UniProtKB/Swiss-Prot annotation:
InterPro entries: Aldolase_TIM, DapA, DapA-like, Schiff_base-form_aldolases_AS, Schiff_base-form_aldolases_CS. NCBIfam families: dapA (TIGR00674). It catalyses: L-aspartate 4-semialdehyde + pyruvate = (2S,4S)-4-hydroxy-2,3,4,5-tetrahydrodipicolinate + H2O + H(+). GO terms for cellular component: cytosol. This is 4-hydroxy-tetrahydrodipicolinate synthase. Belongs to the DapA family. The record marks 44, 107 as: Part of a proton relay during catalysis. The active site is at residues 133, 161. Its EC number is 4.3.3.7. The gene is dapA.
Length: 291
């Protein structure tokens, strides 16, 4: 099982909106050097919704190539069309991704049975390991724990990214899910508590700017070292909050630009971080000793 800090990596772009593959290569190296456990490419933070399918697959291929087996690569492969999600999943496997992250279908608001059949069809279409992704704040459809547990019975559905920030439901899954079913939080602010209650890691936005610290936090929390986890987490609290002061990934892309790691590009309908947001993120970066 893959545990620890998995970065929900941004997709660097030039100011004209084209993907900056050289900057992407540098970010992959940065995470390998910093102890990140895995790279989640073209998810929410990677602006998958703003990429054409061809670009989406080019980013997956680039991350796999640069990783070169040095770090696990999880490819975002979700869609609100089951057929499209199957195609993305198969292509991700062909390109060499180790696992895929598959989001609950958005906009069309499926029932729990619809979610179950959607993910079952994806899993049965290929043998690549699938991580489910529940983020009702974006999809407007919330997959309940009972549905997750039904899906956990399918051999290549291996885990869940829960981005609800609901610790009670996460801890319920820790108690009820198979022991080899990976449970990741998608909420940096509650990640420490989630891992202390038995979660296996975090798919993190904060790790984009603080990969070493997030990797250390995960090691401490998973080991049950509360004091060490708090010591590492406290300076990151501002980032956990203010990297969401506007829609993700607007703040984190600005933060990486401020740190000199990527250019300023972001795609419409997302726009550059506001002046007020820049002040907040700047202060959070300073509090974490990152600038």
């Amino acid at each position: 099982m893959l545990t620890g800090s998995l970065v929900a990596i941004v997709t660097p772009m030039l100011e004209d909106g084209s993907v900056d593959f050289e900057a992407l290569d540098r970010l992959v190296d940065f995470h390998i050097e910093s102890g990140t456990s895995g790279i989640v490419a073209v998810g929410t933070t990677g602006e998958s919704a703003a990429l054409a399918v061809e670009e989406h697959l080019q980013v997956v291929a680039a991350v796999v190539k640069r990783a070169a087996g040095r770090i696990k690569v999880i490819a975002g492969a979700g869609a609100n069309s089951t057929h499209e999600a199957i195609d993305l999943t198969r292509e991700s496997r062909r390109l060499g991704a180790d696992q895929v992250l598959s989001v609950v279908p958005y906009y069309n608001k499926p029932t729990q049975e619809g979610m179950y059949r959607h993910f079952r069809a994806i899993a049965e279409s290929t043998d690549i390991p699938v991580i489910l992704y529940n983020v009702p704040g974006r999809t407007v459809a919330d997959m309940c724990n009972d549905t997750v547990l039904r899906l956990a019975e399918i051999p290549n559905i291996i885990g869940l990214k829960d981005a609800t920030a609901d610790l009670a439901r996460c801890c319920d899954l820790v108690k009820r899910a198979p022991k080899d079913f990976a449970l990741y939080t998608g909420d940096d602010a509650t990640a420490m508590a989630f891992m202390l209650c038995g979660g296996h890691g975090v798919i993190s936005v904060t790790a984009n700017v603080a990969p070493r610290q997030m990797a250390e936090l995960c090691r401490a929390a998973i080991a049950g070292d509360v004091q060490a986890a708090r010591r590492i987490n406290d300076p990151l609290q501002g980032l956990h909050k203010d990297l969401f002061c506007e829609a993700n990934p607007i703040p984190v892309k600005w933060a990486l630009e401020r740190m000199g790691r990527i250019p300023a590009g972001i795609r419409l309908p997302l726009t550059r971080l506001s002046d007020a947001g820049q002040s907040k993120v700047e202060a959070a970066l300073k509090a974490a000793n990152l600038i």
